[in-house]
């Protein structure tokens, strides 16, 4: 007794009404699922590629446009930061934070001092984290605790500056300077 094979499955981009595949219910469900997948893929691609056509710089050559087609306007990646650059950046930002005392406490420019504090702290955070990752695993817990206490103090100082509380700002400033003085000999 010979077993008859079902017709081979074939997938087309468009749904063919005359196809012998769609005669059974299971094949019909398969056809609907694949057409939904195709639709979703096409919508996804068109949603990302069509806006690119409107944002091309027409002054560039067509080969440059083709090379940048999948760039999606992302900035070029930064070159890899080294530990030496991170240490230099950490020292520079620490000096900026130490100068904030003049802005906040002596001149009472709370808003400007807070902006400078947040900018320097943001840059310092990235550099300090890179330095911690470069340290041997046995030294990292100490640096992580210094990292945590430093940036908690910076955050508290920022909130005290927003409230205009000079005594709290001075207290947190002294704490920050002490932590920074503890960090630099260990690096």
UniProtKB/Swiss-Prot annotation:
InterPro entries linked to this entry: PsbQ-like_dom_sf (IPR023222), PSII_PsbQ (IPR008797), PSII_PsbQ_pln (IPR054099)
GO cellular component: chloroplast thylakoid lumen; chloroplast thylakoid membrane; extrinsic component of membrane; photosystem II oxygen evolving complex
TM segment ranges: none
Complex formation: Subunit of the lumenal protuberance of the NDH complex.
Role noted for this protein: Required for both formation and activity of the chloroplast NAD(P)H dehydrogenase (NDH) complex.
Listed Gene3D superfamilies: Oxygen-evolving enhancer protein 3 (PsbQ), four-helix up-down bundle
Transit peptide: 1-32, 33-60
GO molecular function, one term: calcium ion binding
The name this protein goes by in its record: PsbQ-like protein 3, chloroplastic
Keywords: Chloroplast, Membrane, Plastid, Thylakoid, Transit peptide
Family: Belongs to the PsbQ family.
Residue ranges that the Swiss-Prot or TrEMBL entry lists as coiled coil: none
Knockout mutant characteristics: Impaired chloroplastic NAD(P)H dehydrogenase (NDH) activity, probably due to a reduced stability of the NDH complex.
Membrane topology: Peripheral membrane protein
Organism in which the protein naturally occurs: Arabidopsis thaliana
Top-rank taxon, per record: Eukaryota
Gene Ontology BP term (one): response to cold
Subcellular location: Plastid, Chloroplast thylakoid membrane
Main subcellular location of this protein, as a coarse class: plastid
């Amino acid at each position: 007794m010979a077993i008859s094979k079902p017709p081979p499955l074939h997938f087309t981009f468009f749904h063919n009404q005359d196809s012998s595949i769609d005669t059974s219910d299971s094949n019909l469900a398969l056809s609907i699922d694949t057409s939904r997948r195709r639709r979703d893929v096409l919508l996804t691609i068109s949603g990302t590629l069509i806006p690119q056509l409107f944002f091309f710089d027409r002054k560039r050559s067509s080969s440059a446009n083709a090379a940048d087609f999948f760039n999606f306007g992302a900035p070029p990646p930064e070159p890899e930061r080294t530990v030496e650059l991170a240490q230099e950046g950490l020292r520079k930002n620490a000096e900026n934070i130490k100068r904030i005392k003049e802005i906040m406490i002596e001149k009472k420019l709370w808003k400007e001092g807070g902006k400078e504090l947040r900018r320097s702290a943001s840059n310092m955070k990235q550099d300090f984290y890179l330095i911690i990752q470069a340290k041997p695993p046995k030294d990292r817990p100490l640096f992580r605790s210094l990292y945590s206490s430093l940036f908690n103090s910076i955050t508290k100082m920022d909130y005290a500056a927003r409230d205009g509380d000079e005594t709290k700002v001075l207290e947190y400033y002294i704490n920050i300077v002490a932590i920074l003085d503890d960090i630099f000999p260990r690096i």
